């Protein structure tokens, strides 16, 4: 091997004559992409595309779950012999199947890619994607061009799933396979947790506005400058149908420095910093190979477009045998190391041990080959050895001014790479699972900062007598019903059901960055939080038997007490269910940058939107309800109740359709549906509507789209009518309380 060279700046190739195929794609740069076809008959959404789609609040209905409403995965998992499962996985790793032969005598590389591509869809801006629900089994992810051949990987797992049945979910099995694959190669992983529950139909996620695979124009606003462009939110990939980036470079232009720009942005949107990103690429490419021995036009349609007789398998290949050495997965033909089945530092030794020149794979895809190199790379099926090769994105790890110093350090200190990759891999596989309280199994390591850790309960909890006394103190504290309700909502409404982050547990409303979020009205928190802290301190100092109440619990209890009072003021007696057990996190255990992405752009429940945001308010309201795991009726009754309670952001009166603000009632619905009121856009205020008496023209109310959507949208109006009925006044109160408790407890996974 030639001696290490200090620089690889010549790895940036000339840009002339390097245009790739217009249909080029990662893990499939030469396979023609499918063309979406108009369907018939048209749906309501096709006819009225601007109408808010409430149906997204009712995805994954229990009726579609063959295991039924009573199935408890955590309980079923306890019956699993995890060591036996691991042993069977290790045996499978080296048990070649004639219908899909293993490379180098192992499926490790294939399983690592499967797990990575399942987890790698996660994105931080909205918490969508990830491996937590086994979504790789369904469209569109199962047919993305980046996932060619992963249908075979999942099919290889079927005998394992069939054997262990309900004790292991597909979501867990897909991820566990990659972890075991690394261990089979001699790598010591950081840990592993089970606990992912399967979904039973595709998720409705906006992966991009482009209508063809590999499109990039919509997410970048049409710019062609690959070194100075900004990916639109919330997308996590540069290209439609890819997990991260095109390995040939942006839009198939083989420029390692431009590729590094894309890598940094996309991995950052998966919550990975530069060192974690470099570790994942270096470690992930230490094992296995890519597949591109022939032209991509010999590869058939993806699973969702494949004929019925292929039984869910796609990409049938007509090149040679179509499998083994004739497998076409990416069009790229790269083996990174001399030890593709064993963990080693060979990747970095080869990356820095040669100069690299641009070439084309047998599948006509851009890649790099080592200059003046001997054929030292083993063939996966016993053929002649090969020269070292790398992807465009591999060269990025050397020439980029940030990644370069990191990987050079690891070249000299491989033990640092081992630790960095172990932790980054663990984070990749578990980032979307939420708090560690959701984790199952015997291999769970100590909590990490990115898991938003909260302390364990280390004291006796308050009982019913304590709760009653604390409610009295809260109502006598000088804080209004509105202050108590708004503080509790601010704490709990940070929750995201997508990646199970946020919520009231941890009491992080008092910490940065949440304390200064505009939506939380920091000046109001400065009034409310010190009062609540004093009540908690006084109780904890005087309570017997070591009982304590956390500020997180007291904030929620304050909301409960306020709602009970508001219901009494409206003529109804209710009890708001409360279960203590939350604890208070510290600022040092709160990653400010990580929490920043949880800050809402809008919260229609508080009639708040960031100034200048042009998105339709009613769409943002439904999105917020989706994050809070709410149904359409729950969203409806919460908005109506919160308006009656007069808890809008900044004290706004928009939507407060009642003569008795602060009392819990169904007045919002009664007055919204009153046909003696005529609504028109305000001539003086943006995004505001005025409700005028049809006879006199006098202004009765003001509202935003967050309010009027419940009279405009036919689905939501149907629900609003129920709550406006004379015989459903009490039902409205009861349903509001139930929905409120659901929001307060969204992050109480210990109660499940």
UniProtKB/Swiss-Prot annotation:
UniProt gene name: katG1
Family as reported in the entry's similarity comment: Belongs to the peroxidase family. Peroxidase/catalase subfamily.
Biological function: Bifunctional enzyme with both catalase and broad-spectrum peroxidase activity. May play a role in the intracellular survival of mycobacteria.
Pfam families: peroxidase (PF00141)
GO cellular component terms, semicolon-separated: cytosol
Enzyme Commission (EC) number: 1.11.1.21
Organism, scientific name: Mycolicibacterium fortuitum (Mycobacterium fortuitum)
Binding site for heme b: 285
Keyword flag Iron: yes
Name of the protein this chain belongs to: Catalase-peroxidase 1
């Amino acid at each position: 091997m030639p001696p290490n060279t200090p620089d690889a700046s010549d790895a940036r190739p000339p840009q002339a004559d390097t245009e790739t195929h217009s249909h080029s794609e990662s893990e499939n740069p030469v396979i023609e992409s499918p063309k979406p076809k108009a369907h018939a008959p048209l749906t309501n959404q096709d006819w009225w595309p601007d109408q808010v789609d409430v149906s997204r609040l009712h995805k994954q209905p229990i009726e579609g779950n063959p295991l039924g409403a009573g199935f408890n995965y955590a309980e079923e998992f306890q019956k699993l012999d995890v060591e036996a499962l691991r042993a069977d996985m290790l045996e499978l790793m080296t048990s070649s199947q004639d219908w899909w032969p293993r490379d180098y005598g192992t499926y490790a590389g294939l399983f690592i890619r499967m797990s990575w591509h399942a987890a790698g869809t996660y994105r931080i801006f909205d918490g969508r994607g990830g491996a937590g629900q086994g979504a790789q089994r369904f469209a569109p992810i199962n047919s993305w061009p980046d996932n060619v051949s992963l249908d075979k990987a999942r099919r290889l797992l079927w005998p394992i799933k069939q054997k262990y049945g309900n004790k292991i979910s597909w979501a867990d099995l897909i991820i566990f396979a990659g972890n075991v694959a690394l261990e089979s190669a001699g790598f010591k992983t950081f840990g592993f947790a089970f606990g992912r529950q399967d979904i039973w139909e595709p998720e409705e996620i906006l992966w991009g506005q482009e209508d063809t695979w590999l499109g990039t124009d919509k997410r970048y606003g049409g710019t062609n400058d690959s070194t100075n462009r900004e990916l639109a939110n919330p997308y996590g990939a540069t290209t439609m149908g890819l997990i991260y980036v095109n390995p040939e470079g942006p839009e198939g232009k083989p420029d390692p420095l431009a590729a590094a720009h894309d890598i940094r942005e996309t991995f950052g949107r998966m919550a990975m910093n530069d060192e974690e990103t470099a570790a994942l690429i270096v470690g992930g490419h230490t094992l296995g190979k890519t597949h591109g021995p022939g032209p991509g036009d010999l590869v058939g349609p993806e699973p969702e477009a494949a004929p019925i007789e292929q039984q869910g398998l796609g990409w049938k290949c007509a090149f040679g045998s179509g499998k083994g050495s004739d497998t076409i997965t990416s069009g790229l033909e790269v083996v990174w190391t001399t030890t593709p089945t064993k963990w080693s530092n060979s990747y970095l030794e080869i990356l820095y041990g040669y100069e690299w020149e641009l070439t084309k794979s047998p599948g006509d895809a851009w890649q790099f080959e080592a200059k003046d190199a001997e054929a030292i790379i083993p063939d996966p099926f016993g053929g002649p050895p090969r020269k070292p090769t790398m992807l465009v994105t591999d060269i990025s790890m050397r020439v980029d001014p940030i990644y370069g110093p990191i990987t050079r350090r690891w070249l000299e200190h491989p033990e640092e790479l081992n630790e960095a990759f172990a932790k980054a891999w663990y984070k990749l596989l578990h980032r979307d699972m939420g708090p560690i309280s959701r984790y199952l199994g015997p291999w769970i390591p100590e909590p990490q900062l990115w898991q938003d850790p909260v302390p364990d309960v280390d004291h006796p909890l308050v009982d019913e007598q304590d709760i009653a006394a604390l409610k009295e103190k809260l109502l006598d504290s000088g804080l209004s019903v509105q202050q108590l309700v708004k503080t509790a909502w601010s704490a709990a409404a940070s929750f995201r059901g997508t990646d199970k982050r946020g919520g009231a547990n941890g009491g992080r409303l008092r910490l940065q960055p949440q304390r200064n979020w505009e939506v939380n009205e920091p000046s109001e928190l400065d009034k409310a939080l010190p009062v609540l802290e004093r009540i908690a301190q006084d109780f904890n100092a005087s309570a017997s038997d070591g009982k304590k109440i956390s500020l997180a619990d007291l904030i929620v209890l304050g909301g409960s007490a306020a709602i009970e009072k508001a219901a009494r003021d409206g003529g109804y007696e209710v009890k708001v269910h409360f279960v203590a057990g939350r604890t208070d996190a510290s600022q040092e255990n709160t990653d400010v940058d990580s929490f920043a992405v949880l800050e809402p752009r809008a919260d229609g429940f508080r009639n708040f939107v960031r100034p200048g945001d042009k998105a339709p308010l009613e769409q943002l309201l439904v999105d917020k309800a989706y994050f809070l795991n709410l149904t359409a009726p729950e969203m409806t009754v919460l908005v109506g109740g919160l308006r009656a309670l007069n808890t809008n952001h900044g004290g706004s009166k928009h939507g407060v359709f009642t003569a008795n603000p602060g009392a819990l009632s169904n007045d919002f619905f009664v007055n919204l549906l009153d046909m003696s009121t005529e609504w028109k856009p305000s001539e003086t205020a943006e995004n505001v509507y005025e409700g005028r008496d049809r006879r006199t023209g006098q202004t009765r109310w003001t509202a935003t789209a967050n309010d009027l959507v419940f009279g405009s949208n036919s689905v939501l109006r149907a629900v609003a009518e129920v709550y406006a009925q004379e015989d459903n006044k009490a039902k409205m109160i009861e349903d509001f309380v139930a929905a409120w408790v659901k929001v307060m407890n969204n992050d109480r996974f210990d109660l499940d």
